[in-house]
Amino acid sequence: MQVTSVGHAGFLIQTQAGSILCDPWVNPAYFASWFPFPDNSGLDWGALGECDYLYVSHLHKDHFDAENLRAHVNKDAVVLLPDFPVPDLRNELQKLGFHRFFETTDSVKHRLRGPNGDLDVMIIALRAPADGPIGDSALVVADGETTAFNMNDARPVDLDVLASEFGHIDVHMLQYSGAIWYPMVYDMPARAKDAFGAQKRQRQMDRARQYIAQVGATWVVPSAGPPCFLAPELRHLNDDGSDPANIFPDQMVFLDQMRAHGQDGGLLMIPGSTADFTGTTLNSLRHPLPAEQVEAIFTTDKAAYIADYADRMAPVLAAQKAGWAAAAGEPLLQPLRTLFEPIMLQSNEICDGIGYPVELAIGPETIVLDFPKRAVREPIPDERFRYGFAIAPELVRTVLRDNEPDWVNTIFLSTRFRAWRVGGYNEYLYTFFKCLTDERIAYADGWFAEAHDDSSSITLNGWEIQRRCPHLKADLSKFGVVEGNTLTCNLHGWQWRLDDGRCLTARGHQLRSSRP
């Protein structure tokens, strides 16, 4: 088996039985905020696109690159389709001309039979509202000699099926770096922002190392990030200095952490690097550049590399911005009322979970999303808000023009906004913004309405707690860490006060906990 990095979470997996192109992203995403790092625009995308199978893990725009898929990927390729609760991924791929779909069942091994041989594959589908745009997934591929687990940026909660269905995993590709807007966009004191950033930077790497320990693969490829920020107003987000609060550490930083914790087998790959495996044996690792130049991209030459990359991509960035809607136009109150109020009326669990009005400051306009009243309105004089966003009007007008069903997958991941809040993170609020269609909101609201099993118990540091995390049902025997009277689930970094089970991260999500 040959595994070639095509950038970010993208890989070409080549076997005697056929090739699988995974998450081929090259064009800037999220209002031209994110670019692949290192640069992958020089790869031969026409050749890469002549694949037998296509796997797109989910619809986030750093995985689903519609322009690249349309222009370069063989439309007769068989699409390996995750078992998602809504059909959006299949629908979007069909719009691009793909017509051959292999529908998988969540966490079930399937055999792909082709003219050149057979492959065993399994797609672990994640279906919680917090998983991607209503769906994220991870892919296992076995060719009879070698088994690869491409986890990209998915966060599976139960990996026992890997060993039961495939035995030993030979190579594991996974995310370890940041892919979020927190804490950078929030209005808070610099000292607090630095503390939260440093905490997040470390927790996301701790989570990745826990996954590595669980999977137990011989070889590990850190991937699926970080992105590169080339717009002048966003360049400070790159981890090209020595800021311990930067949430976007690169592969070299994580490989050092792996080694420091006794985890060997980490492989550094850049776009165009190819690793050849036979079972647990790494036959070769070839890079498009000498090894010392590859490492320098992440170390001594990183700032200069990003500066040169920004110069090369300046025309691309300008062309992207030219495609945005104009900032000026008709008042936005009525278009936003037309968009949001029907969704509010279908989502009692989510609106009640949000629990308060939210302010949208869009240029000169202030618009209130009054979730308790299921209404979009103007503010009341001297009204104060627990949560608010300041978003440039051209971004809002663009997503309205394009009928975007997901503001997380467009505006929020761009980091081109400001936010403020009183109290903790509100998961229901961001879920609302990613569910702006009837199908999505119906699924998400129903998901929150279901009762989750908390009957099984474990003991951690002298506390008896429910085994499954109240947030997304992670196994707390694997992801739970107790410090004093605080439990942290490292899957998403949520915390609970063990004295009374109160969630310290968001409303609701009560934990059952006691001293035995």
Swiss-Prot record:
Cofactors, names only: [2Fe-2S] cluster
Protein name, entry field: Putative Rieske 2Fe-2S iron-sulfur protein Rv3818
Start and end residues of each Rieske domain: 429-516
Pfam families, sorted: Lactamase_B_3, Rieske, SCP2_Rv3818
Protein residues bound to [2Fe-2S] cluster: C469, H471, C489, H492
InterPro entries per record: RibonucZ/Hydroxyglut_hydro, Rieske_2Fe-2S, Rieske_2Fe-2S_sf
Organism in which the protein naturally occurs: Mycobacterium tuberculosis (strain ATCC 25618 / H37Rv)
Uppermost EC category: oxidoreductase
Sorted UniProt keywords: 2Fe-2S, Iron, Iron-sulfur, Metal-binding, Oxidoreductase
GO CC list: cytoplasm
Miscellaneous comment: Was identified as a high-confidence drug target.
EC number: 1.-.-.-
PANTHER family with a match to the protein in the record: N-ACYL-PHOSPHATIDYLETHANOLAMINE-HYDROLYZING PHOSPHOLIPASE D
Annotated GO MF terms: 2 iron, 2 sulfur cluster binding; metal ion binding; monooxygenase activity; oxidoreductase activity, acting on paired donors, with incorporation or reduction of molecular oxygen
Cofactor note as given: Binds 1 [2Fe-2S] cluster per subunit.
